[in-house]
Design a protein with these regions (language model features):
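Short acidic-hydrophobic, aromatic-tinged amphipathic segments that line or gate anion-handling sites
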Residues: 66-73
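Domain-level signal for Mg2+-assisted phosphodiester chemistry and nucleotide/NA-binding surfaces
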Residues: 1-64
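Short, hydrophobic beta-strand segments that form beta-sheet elements in well-ordered domains
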Residues: 31-33, 90-93
Length: 123
């Protein structure tokens, strides 16, 4: 399962208990974080805004997964590449355009439903 920056920021921005919800849905899973997503979080973490604070938490949460390097420099592109190559069965995101790209590519998406719950959307 691969994690997007928006998913890693959700515990702060949406009060989602990310890892508890993932375990509820799918049990224990191997979590992947593309290096490009980690770099995106590091860029967003600069400053004193609420988004920066959420990105700092998200960056810390990447430690719970395995960082993987891809040839893609953009986080969304890296997630699509991992999933379509079969390296990630699901992608967790709150990003609507990424969600649509993944579903169009036949990849199941774990996304927020309501304020604090995650659900699986199948293609």
């Amino acid at each position: 399962m691969a994690l997007d920056a928006s998913a890693l920021m959700a515990p702060v921005e949406r009060d989602v208990r990310l890892f508890e919800e993932l375990e509820r849905l799918l049990g224990e899973v191997d979590l992947l974080v593309p290096a490009a997503v980690r770099a995106e979080l590091d860029r967003l973490a600069a400053g004193a805004s609420a988004e920066a604070a959420a990105a700092r938490v998200g960056s810390d949460l990447t430690e719970r997964g395995r960082t993987v390097t891809t040839s893609e420099r953009n986080g969304d592109d890296a997630l699509v590449a991992l999933a379509t190559a079969g390296e990630a069965e699901y992608v967790v995101t709150a990003d609507r355009p990424l969600r649509d790209r993944l579903l169009d590519a036949g990849v199941p998406v774990v996304e927020t439903r309501g304020r604090t719950r995650l659900e699986i959307t199948e293609p």
